[in-house]
Amino acid sequence: MRRAAGTSAALLAALALTAAPAQAAKAPDCPDSVKAPSAIVIEVSTGTVACARQADKERSIGSTTKLMTALLTLEEAKLSQTFKASSYRPSSIESQIGLQPGERMRVSDLMRGLLLESGNDAAMALAQGVSGSTKAFVRAMNRRARRLGLSHTHYDNPIGLDGAKNYSSARDLVTLATVLRTNAFFKKVVDSPSGTLKTGVRQRTFRNRNTLIGKFPYVNGVKTGHTRGAGYVLVGSASRNGIQLVSAVLATPSEAARDADTIALYKWAFPRFQRIRAVIEDRPMATAQIRYRSGAELKLVPDRTIRRIVPRGHRQAVSLKVDAPSVVEGPIRRGQRLGKVEVRQGGKTVATVALIAQSAVPAAKIAQKTKTAAQSPWVIGGVASALLLATVLLAVRRRARLTRRRRPRQTSAA
């Protein structure tokens, strides 16, 4: 089976912040406008927890269990594959897409049925199609949870039915959703008000059970859940002005309460972050002297702009490390890479930008090199030393001649 690239090193570093106990201790409690017993909202690019309430408490999570079902499917199967409906028969009160015995459907459509309609029959078809059996798939779910560091999560089924061994926490759900959002197909589906399943024995169209999609333009995901034991659960996401949030509310008493709590989290969290330009394209960040051209300098500029999210009023959370030459020599073409800038945040390098020549520098002419060489302190010092030595030698020779002239002549006796 294939392994999809869903978790980059940079992303996992950010996710580690959401799971760190120290970070949890620093996170403020959620505002009074949020009534959910367990809630959390994070800023995705840094993993900063805007607020948290009982975020690590283990609770029943209903159909948000299907987020792990989705992740394993995206990592282990191709969207173009076709899976056969399982023998699982959901009861009339379970959410389902109406798969018929032996019906075959493309994985992409089963995923739409899983994420939009929350179909239990779609979940079982995916589980058995990926791992061969439900038990094998559940084992894989728990292995994946451990690798992601979801320390308050355990799965007992790929659907989300209530059970003592099927639970998670608000923080773990947010971590899982953040990983899933790196997948373009997932992001598109969960941000759709509806979806049409075109394969199978008949065409089916379903509305997204996350009714915030389409109602609030900035909401762009993710997944609802509901059982008697879980109450009403919503793992959500929202984006505004380049700031991406992911949230979770657990154990709310109704759909209305679930939605109200989620929107309250966003209204509270968005103003607490700002997007800054840490590095600005074509703005000089270093200068280098140009060899053989007295007083001339070359400006070095970033080749692109880097934007970062920081807590509002804390631009100093981002620092820059400039690595550039102090002296350059032509020929240098405009745009030639000569150095770099490292953007650091949270004690880590989060981006590296090339420093390029803002203008061209022609090769120095021989006359310039000669003139510069003649003006060099080393050359001047050398000439001065040579003149001094010559003067000393002349003085010594002159004194020697005078000494010889002054000596009396010696005559021999007869």
Language model region names:
Residues 151-154, 162-167, 171-409, 413:
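Domain-terminus/edge residues, biased toward the C-terminal soluble/receptor-binding domains
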Residues 2-3, 59, 66, 144, ...:
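Basic side chains
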Residues 1-24, 381-398:
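Secretory targeting and sorting signals
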Residues 6-9, 16, 28, 33, ...:
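Proteins with a high burden of low-complexity, intrinsically disordered sequence enriched in S/T/G/P/A and R
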Residues 22-188, 196:
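Active-site-adjacent loops and short helices of periplasmic peptidoglycan-processing enzymes
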